Curated annotation (Swiss-Prot):
Name of the protein: Mitochondrial ATPase complex subunit ATP10
Organism name: Candida glabrata (strain ATCC 2001 / BCRC 20586 / JCM 3761 / NBRC 0622 / NRRL Y-65 / CBS 138) (Yeast)
Name of the gene this protein is made from: ATP10
Listed PANTHER family: MITOCHONDRIAL ATPASE COMPLEX SUBUNIT ATP10
Family from the record: Belongs to the ATP10 family.
GO CC entries: mitochondrial inner membrane
Main subcellular localisation: mitochondrion
Pfam families xref list: ATP-synt_10
UniProt GO molecular function: unfolded protein binding
């Protein structure tokens, strides 16, 4: 009986070690690759349109742990996540100055374009919780997404061009939406304390379209797919009335990108007609 017990114990221990080793593998393999700046060719976005109360899943359920294929897939996902740590993001931002990719030559056609994700949050004008897609539907929207002051600053270059004296917050062809991503609970708490200060720095007429949303709503790999994972940069989406992403940019705006973005907005306005 003792022999059987010892054998069972050894088997259990070896199984636990093997199980643990599989999930430690991502940590061991987490060697980040150098970021390469490329021009966007394929549409960016999700295959399904956003809808209220949708919750994007991350990782595996408990039952999935016993599914070899799903577990292996999750291990590969974790390798990517561990490799792209905060230090990696900072180093990449410094190297690229936030220009993580180059915007496409032209806008993506409606039949090829993918969807903007579901996001919920509050605006500066109201404490009520709402869904961002509700204000996007039926309108052409230019959306700024940022999490930091530097991201806010550089993404604003696509809206306001001081050299040309252009302020497209007043553009009649579209609406401009600001999405301030709150990274974590600490930042969310700090924002609550400094909300009045934030309101004073944002013009009152923009409060309705200035959103505060928790970044965690969109899981890591989905942020990778949407190309918005680097917390230090700022991002621009042009979204059509059907909630599809038709154009995207990031980092500082060159004169060419500024003009290209607003040319896209003009073309989408003609589509509506």
């Amino acid at each position: 009986m003792r022999v059987v017990f010892q054998q069972c114990t050894k088997f259990s221990t070896s199984c636990n070690r093997a199980f643990l080793a599989r999930f430690l593998k991502p940590v061991m393999n987490a060697s980040p690759k150098e970021h390469v700046v490329k021009q966007l060719l394929k549409p960016v976005g999700l295959n399904v349109p956003p809808r209220p109360n949708i919750k994007y899943s991350e990782g595996n359920s408990w039952l999935d742990l016993f599914d070899g294929a799903k577990t292996e897939e999750r291990i590969k996902e974790l390798e990517i996540e561990f490799a792209k740590s905060g230090m990696y993001e900072m180093a990449t931002f410094r190297k690229t100055n936030g220009k993580l990719f180059l915007s496409p030559e032209s806008y993506w056609k409606a039949d090829k374009a993918l969807y903007f994700p579901h996001l919920s949050g509050r605006t500066l004008s109201s404490e009520d919780h709402g869904n961002v897609e509700d204000v996007l539907r039926g309108k052409t929207s230019v959306i700024r997404v940022f999490s930091t002051q530097v991201g806010d600053k550089i993404s604003r270059e696509y809206i306001k061009n001081t050299e040309l004296g252009i302020d497209n917050y007043e553009n009649q062809s579209c609406q401009v939406i600001d999405i301030n991503f709150l990274e974590n609970k600490l930042k969310s708490w700090l924002f609550k304390l400094s909300l009045n200060n934030l309101k004073s720095t944002v013009p009152v007429q923009r409060h309705d379209n200035y959103w505060l949303c928790h970044r965690e709503q969109i899981p890591f790999l989905m942020r990778e797919r949407l190309l918005i994972n680097n917390v230090y940069s700022g991002y621009i989406f042009v979204v059509d009335p059907n909630l599809k992403i038709r154009f995207m940019a990031c980092g500082p705006a060159s004169a060419d990108e500024f003009n290209k973005l607003w040319k896209v907005v003009g073309q989408l306005s003609k589509e509506k007609k």
